[in-house]
């Protein structure tokens, strides 16, 4: 029998529920030094930034927000050794990452005399390891003052780098875990992407553009295909799960269209340049 090294054993023993509990414990440690004050991340946010945060809505502090999101209940389950869902884990992580983002923005812009202390790098590292194990990534959107978690999708990130900021947010948001099963929100994002892709007609492979047009116009995205002149009988009895699968396929087709257009309008010119230099 082949002996496994300690690093293989460490990976095998990884438990996302225990990791959530560890992160919760770390969150209770002081991580910001401001003058003579030593504060936890949440204490810093509550005292200096919560009311200024664009996404605080009607909540009064971090504790109020955690209670509403069910995070306190999630942590209780972890500490008692009960199981928690991946979605509960992602809600907790997204909350923590937004608290971190608020602190980082504040220290960079307002409280530049403050600085993070030793537990902070460990918190960041453990979050990144947990996200990697879950196959998720976090994305910052400065304009919206928010951090969201999305499944890793290299095509989506490539497209987000190409398009304008508002559409980039929609491209990334499509993969947000809370949008699973939300056909209305997915449909609205696909409509916005369809408007973008339509302008690329002349640059796209005819077969690809034809498939894009068919999907955008016939599965209740651009048009109401459930009634009226554009009604499609097949859609009247289709299960939501199957329709969502087709929405996800359409999303991938639209990403391909945007990437192909970028290749033909930008990348090919760069390749011509390098060909002229490297012979």
What is the role of each PLM region?
Residues 1-127:
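Charged interaction/catalytic cores of defense and host-pathogen modules
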């Amino acid at each position: 029998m082949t002996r496994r090294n300690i690093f293989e054993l460490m990976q095998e023993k990884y438990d996302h529920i225990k990791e959530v509990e560890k992160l919760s414990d770390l969150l209770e440690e002081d991580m910001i030094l401001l003058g003579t004050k030593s504060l936890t991340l949440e204490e810093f946010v509550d005292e200096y930034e919560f009311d200024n945060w664009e996404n605080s809505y009607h909540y009064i502090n971090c504790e109020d927000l955690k209670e509403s999101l069910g995070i306190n209940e999630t942590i209780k389950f972890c500490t008692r050794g009960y199981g928690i869902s991946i979605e509960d884990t992602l809600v907790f992580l997204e909350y923590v990452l937004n608290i971190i983002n608020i602190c980082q923005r504040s220290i960079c812009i307002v409280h530049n005399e403050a600085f993070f202390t030793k537990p902070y790098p460990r918190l960041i590292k453990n979050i990144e390891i947990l996200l990697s194990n879950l196959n998720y990534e976090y994305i910052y959107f400065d304009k919206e003052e928010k951090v969201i978690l999305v499944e890793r999708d290299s095509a989506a990130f490539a497209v987000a780098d190409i398009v304008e900021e508002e559409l980039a947010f929609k491209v990334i948001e499509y993969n947000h875990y809370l949008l699973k099963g939300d056909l209305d929100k997915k449909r609205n994002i696909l409509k916005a992407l369809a408007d973008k892709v339509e302008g690329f007609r002349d640059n796209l492979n005819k077969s690809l553009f034809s498939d894009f047009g068919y999907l955008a116009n016939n599965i209740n995205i651009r048009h109401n295909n459930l009634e009226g002149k554009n009604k499609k009988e097949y859609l009247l009895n289709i299960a939501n799960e199957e329709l969502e699968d087709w929405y996800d396929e359409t999303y991938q087709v639209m990403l391909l269209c945007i990437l192909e257009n970028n290749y033909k309008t930008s990348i090919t010119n760069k390749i011509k340049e390098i060909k002229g230099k490297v012979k």
